[in-house]
């Protein structure tokens, strides 16, 4: 019997872009941010990154909280950090909540559907490993009309551990037979490099970060590509 072939994808940032999040922020508070010489993209990235940092610190110290809750809580602090002296006088709670809601409106990247199809046509089973909740993440695929069975959507949120803790990847790796072909694919170098450390083969797409900053990571990627379809083709070729 031939070895089974699997690719586990990160979702948010890899399969899904942040454009809708940034656009939502711009729609809700863009003019207010502009009055402080702050762009929606700059604030959105800073807010999201600050939330990821606190989310990870909470997880590491065994006080795991859902990411969406952390994102909401960090809103006013982030505004202050980017130069708004009195954030609550500039933005209302209702506007904050509307900005948080925009995070649920993320859309699949161009090429994501083609990427999955290339892999499935080559006999791969496509999985997703996310720190987000399955309902929200599944909605990204459902709205785009892209097949992603719920049973193939894995969240480490319920385990009380967040990527890139190595313990977040090991249960997924353990689902597969030792001789199976097992890839992890992401547009975050911190994510895919951690997956490689537990035993996955690594595929990295530059579509989000552009610069992999490879010098600070101690793992080598077998596939690096600029688009999701090209990454999929590299995985197929590398598995022959």
Each model region followed by its residue ranges:
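Hydrophobic alpha-helical core bundles mediating ligand binding, dimerization, or RNAP-core interactions
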Residues: 25-29, 47-51, 71-72, 99-103, ...
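A metal-dependent, Asp-based hydrolase signature
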Residues: 41, 45-97
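Active-site neighborhood of HAD-like aspartate-dependent phosphohydrolases
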Residues: 1-49
């Amino acid at each position: 019997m031939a070895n089974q072939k699997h690719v586990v994808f990160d979702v948010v940032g890899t399969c899904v872009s942040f454009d809708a999040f940034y656009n939502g922020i711009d729609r809700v508070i863009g003019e207010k941010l502009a009055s402080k010489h702050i762009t929606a993209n700059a604030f959105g990235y800073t807010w999201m990154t600050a939330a990821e940092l606190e989310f990870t610190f909470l997880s590491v110290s065994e006080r795991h909280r859902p990411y969406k809750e952390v994102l909401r809580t960090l809103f006013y602090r982030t505004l202050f950090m980017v130069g708004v002296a009195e954030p609550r006088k500039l933005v209302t709670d209702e506007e904050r909540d509307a900005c948080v809601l925009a995070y649920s409106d993320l859309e699949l990247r161009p090429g994501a559907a083609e990427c999955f199809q290339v892999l499935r046509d080559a006999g791969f089973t496509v999985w997703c490993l996310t720190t987000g909740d399955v309902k929200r993440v599944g909605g990204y695929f459902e709205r785009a009309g892209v097949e992603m069975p719920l049973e193939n959507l894995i969240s480490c949120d319920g385990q009380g551990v967040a990527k890139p803790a190595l313990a977040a990847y090991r249960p997924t790796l353990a689902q597969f037979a030792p001789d199976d072909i097992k890839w992890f694919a992401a547009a975050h170098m911190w994510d895919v490099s951690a997956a490689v450390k537990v035993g996955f083969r690594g595929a990295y797409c530059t579509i989000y970060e552009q610069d992999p900053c490879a010098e600070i990571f101690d793992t080598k990627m077998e596939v690096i590509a600029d688009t999701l379809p090209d990454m999929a083709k590299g995985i197929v070729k590398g598995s022959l």
